[in-house]
Amino acid sequence: MQRVTLTLDDDLLAALDALSARRGYHNRSEAVRDILRDALNQDPPSPESRRGYAVLSYVYEHEKRELASRLVATQHHHHDLSVATLHVHISHEDCLEIAVLKGDMAEVQHFADDVIAQRGVRHGHLQCLADD
């Protein structure tokens, strides 16, 4: 490991310390390492890491005109990527779906884009983990 020095303004340092306390980190370095890992996982995978896993989560209005049917059709069109899907009724109007995906990361990104772009889908998020 290498030692580095960071300069942070007071508000950002206070936020880091509060996060560290909430999550039970023993020191700031552990918190910064996890924050960096998370940020790096948010970037699209590099071309050399073409396969991997991903979690796609999104909320949608199940009564929106034919949205549920369109989402199911999209999932079936990309059936080879799907490992598992969890469906949760979070209110009378809204459903939360969480899909675990595996495969070519460009295809995974395309699938996520198709789902998130549907009218009535909110809070779409794709978390990627490329194979090492």
From Swiss-Prot:
Family to which this protein belongs: Belongs to the transcriptional regulatory CopG/NikR family.
Cofactor: how and how many bound: Binds 1 nickel ion per subunit.
UniProt keyword list: DNA-binding, Metal-binding, Nickel, Repressor, Transcription, Transcription regulation
GO terms assigned for molecular function: DNA-binding transcription factor activity; nickel cation binding; sequence-specific DNA binding
Keyword Transcription part of the UniProt annotation: yes
UniProt organism field: Klebsiella pneumoniae (strain 342)
Quaternary structure and interacting proteins, as annotated: Homotetramer.
Organism taxonomic ancestry: Bacteria, Pseudomonadati, Pseudomonadota, Gammaproteobacteria, Enterobacterales
UniProt: Ni(2+) binding residues: 76, 87, 89, 95
InterPro entries: Acetolactate_synth/TF_NikR_C, ACT-like_dom_sf, Arc_rbn_hlx_hlx, CopG, CopG/NikR_regulator, Ni_resp_reg_NikR, Nickel_NikR_proteobac, Ribbon_hlx_hlx
Protein name according to UniProt: Nickel-responsive regulator
Cofactor requirements of the protein: Ni(2+)
Function noted in UniProt: Transcriptional repressor of the nikABCDE operon. Is active in the presence of excessive concentrations of intracellular nickel.
